[in-house]
């Protein structure tokens, strides 16, 4: 029994390991970049094998990440991880933005065409689904406690868009 209690924290830990524990790690403007293999050619650093990007409030993992040294930006496919406590999956990363992103926290689910890796992260072209609302918004800011949407159109029922509410701003708290 005691043995299982010691293993419990390991089993409850996220699937990705800390970026600092990878064999190759370097510090970038956006946080720690790490992976199992590292190569460098003409200003492009390629990190492969459980590649990761991590800083407080952000932990991403991808098959590989390219760091474009001169621009300070990134290229990566199929990312997963967390941002400000929101679980996320993204089809890709270009520069300092995640592309075609799915986010989830509590009862809220969101999709964004782009998620800028600012502090806090800002989404563009957002669709948010709460238990009672479906919302399309031009922009959203995601924090650990809320999703703040600007310039949006809401459908308050799952029955479709027969009823629409247009507003300048709305705040959805994470439960």
Residue spans of the language-model regions?
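Structural signature for solvent-exposed beta-strand/loop edge elements and short helix-capping sites
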Residues: 18-175
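Positively charged n-region of N-terminal signal peptides that target proteins for export
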Residues: 1-3
């Amino acid at each position: 029994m005691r043995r299982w209690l010691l293993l419990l924290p390991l089993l409850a830990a996220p699937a990705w390991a800390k970026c600092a524990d990878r064999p190759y790690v370097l510090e970038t403007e956006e946080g720690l970049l790490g992976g199992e293999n590292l190569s460098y050619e003409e200003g492009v650093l390629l990190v492969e094998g459980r590649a990761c990007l991590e800083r407080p409030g952000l932990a991403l993992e991808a098959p590989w990440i390219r760091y474009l040294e001169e621009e300070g930006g990134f290229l990566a496919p199929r990312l997963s991880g967390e941002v400000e406590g929101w679980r996320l999956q993204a089809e890709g990363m270009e520069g300092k933005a995640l592309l075609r992103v799915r986010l989830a926290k509590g009862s809220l689910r969101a999709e964004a065409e782009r998620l800028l890796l600012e502090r806090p992260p800002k989404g563009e072209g957002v669709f948010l689904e709460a238990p009672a609302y479906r919302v399309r918004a031009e922009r959203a800011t995601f924090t650990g406690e809320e999703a703040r949407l600007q310039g949006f159109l809401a459908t308050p029922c799952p029955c479709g868009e027969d009823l629409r509410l247009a507003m300048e701003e709305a705040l959805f708290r994470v439960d």
